[in-house]
Amino acid sequence: MRVRFFCEIDFYIVRGELSLIIKDVDTQFTVGDIAAKREELIRKLLEKGVDKINKRLEVPLVPLRLGIISSSQAAGYIDALKQFEESGIGFHITLCDVNVQGEAAASQIVAAIQTFSRRSDIDIVMIMRGGGSKGDLAVFDDESMALAISRCKHPVFTGIGHEIDT
């Protein structure tokens, strides 16, 4: 990730000290890079038709056996779990507790998708996390994750973001 700082350089002659004082951060600089990479990935996946593969799978009329990929602490998961419980419908939830941000997140999510794909006791797979900064959510702009979703033997639904993302 690239970051642009607006700085002031200060030199204190008496002690021979050089200071770099950060005055501001150009957040649009990094956001522009993230957006460009995301658009390129989307274009590449659309060209391959990856976006349509998982959509062809039949969704059960009432999917009761839910394979959920999320952090057990994610706001989106906690809210969804509350809704499932309050619905009075007999959902059977299997959670695959993963990191939903950071270096390990994409590979953990891909592994969880592959694990649920091999299971016959799952009706649908759901990937969930709460909101966050565009940088935090960028982990989901991952080609290996998109390919894993397209290859999953169960329909995959996503719930990414929560209230207002920053």
Whereabouts are the PLM-identified features?
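Short, glycine/charged-enriched hinge/interface segments at domain edges or termini
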Residues: 6-96
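Short glycine/threonine-rich loop/turn motifs
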Residues: 67-166
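Short, small/acidic-rich helices and loops at N termini and domain boundaries
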Residues: 1-5
